[in-house]
């Protein structure tokens, strides 16, 4: 494999010295870029874009042509696993993802099998291989999956949800059924991420988008427990390097110590927590990723630079152990030039902290 020209992202995750703070953006390949919209139109629809390795690679690389980002992230969707389990994923315009056959009872859970990462999900692995080839060693490639809990919310609710009543009903009325589903999902995520690593992903991330809707006790039992299982099951060395794993629970600031105790290399932070507090709590154990509110990218350039400076100051002089990111995905109507201001500000303003 080609030697990495810029490995700052991997080094920062492993708390090795870097000369500036590396940065990437959640959803950096996406609808805020006109070139993405053009490629998506060429593909026909979102899943066709995901399933075409050349086009998935093209959109993965688009933000890297505009901005000096320190990592690329696989262009895919967290719902590939439930789709491959036969739930019938489709997208309603303006409404997000839906499933034709949601999970309603134990019989539904019993019916689903573990998808083969080089079978039903081979299109994802083909995209990973294509992206690695097209990156030519410029920056590392991040693979990812949704967390078992987050995948289960979509599978039981039948799509997005505001109140999560269906999955919470299952959690409280039929906990054994939900545990059965989560266990299958954890096994599937382990196979899926390990296949991404074998195909060329140099780091992996688990997105627990909806862990923050749970009580502390339920979070430990129904979300974190299964992410811990995933961390234990992952390949951690490949191509002669450690493969870092990042866990990100949105609205998970209450549980940072528990997340850090899973054995992950890094913990993702959303914008609802002060990074200085997070560092004081878990910075001795793990690297931190985050955590600017994506809405700040609507502001004037000076305000964006100011916010970047505040977060860098909050993390302080550690010299490493921080990957700068947004606290969640970039919004689809952010001007691309503002994203450029953000990336440049991280590089410029972080250098004094790495002397």
UniProtKB/Swiss-Prot annotation:
GO cellular component, one term: cytosol
Entry keyword annotation includes Zinc: no
Entry-linked Pfam families: URO-D
Spans traversing the lipid bilayer: none
Location(s), subcellular: Cytoplasm
Keywords recorded for this protein, A-Z: Cytoplasm, Decarboxylase, Lyase, Porphyrin biosynthesis
Catalytic activity: uroporphyrinogen III + 4 H(+) = coproporphyrinogen III + 4 CO2
Biological process according to GO: protoporphyrinogen IX biosynthetic process from glutamate
Entries under InterPro entries matching the protein: UROD/MetE-like_sf, Uroporphyrinogen_deCO2ase_HemE, Uroporphyrinogen_deCOase
Residues of the site described as Transition state stabilizer: 77
GO molecular function, one term: uroporphyrinogen decarboxylase activity
PANTHER family reported for this sequence: METHYLTETRAHYDROFOLATE:HOMOCYSTEINE METHYLTRANSFERASE RELATED, UROPORPHYRINOGEN DECARBOXYLASE
Function: Catalyzes the decarboxylation of four acetate groups of uroporphyrinogen-III to yield coproporphyrinogen-III.
Cited HAMAP family: URO_D (MF_00218)
This protein's name: Uroporphyrinogen decarboxylase
Gene source species: Aliivibrio fischeri (strain ATCC 700601 / ES114)
């Amino acid at each position: 494999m080609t030697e990495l020209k810029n490995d700052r992202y991997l080094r920062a995750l492993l708390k090795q010295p870097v000369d500036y703070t590396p940065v990437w953006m959640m959803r950096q390949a996406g609808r805020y870029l006109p070139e993405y919209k053009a490629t998506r139109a060429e593909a026909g629809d979102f899943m066709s874009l995901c399933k075409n390795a050349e086009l998935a690679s093209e959109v993965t690389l688009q933000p890297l042509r505009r901005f000096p980002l320190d990592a690329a992230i696989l262009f895919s969707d967290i719902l590939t696993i439930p789709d491959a389990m036969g739930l019938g994923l489709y997208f309603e315009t303006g409404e997000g993802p839906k499933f034709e056959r949601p999970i309603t009872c134990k019989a539904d859970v019993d019916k689903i099998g573990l998808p083969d990462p080089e079978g039903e999900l081979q299109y994802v692995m083909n995209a990973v291989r294509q992206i690695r080839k097209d990156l030519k060693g410029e920056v590392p490639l991040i693979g990812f999956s949704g967390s078992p809990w987050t995948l289960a919310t979509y599978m039981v609710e039948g799509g997005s949800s505001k109140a999560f009543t269906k999955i919470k009903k299952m959690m409280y009325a039929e906990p054994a059924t939900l545990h059965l589903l989560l266990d299958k999902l954890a096994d599937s995520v382990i196979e899926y991420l390990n296949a991404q690593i074998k195909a060329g992903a140099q780091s992996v991330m688990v997105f627990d988008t909806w862990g923050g809707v749970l009580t502390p006790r339920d979070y430990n039992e129904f979300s974190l427990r299964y992410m811990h299982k995933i961390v234990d099951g992952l390949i951690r060395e490949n191509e002669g390097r450690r493969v870092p794993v990042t866990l990100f629970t949105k609205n998970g600031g209450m549980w940072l110590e528990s997340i850090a105790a899973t054995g992950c290399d890094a913990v993702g932070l959303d914008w609802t927590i002060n990074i200085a507090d997070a560092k004081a709590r878990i910075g001795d154990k793990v690297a931190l990723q985050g955590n600017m509110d994506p809405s700040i990218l609507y502001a004037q350039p000076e305000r964006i630079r100011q916010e970047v400076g505040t977060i860098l100051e909050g993390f302080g002089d550690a010299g490493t152990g921080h990957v700068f990111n947004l606290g969640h995905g970039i919004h689809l109507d952010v001007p691309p030039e503002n994203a450029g201001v953000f990336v440049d500000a991280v590089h410029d303003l972080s250098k004094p902290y790495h002397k």
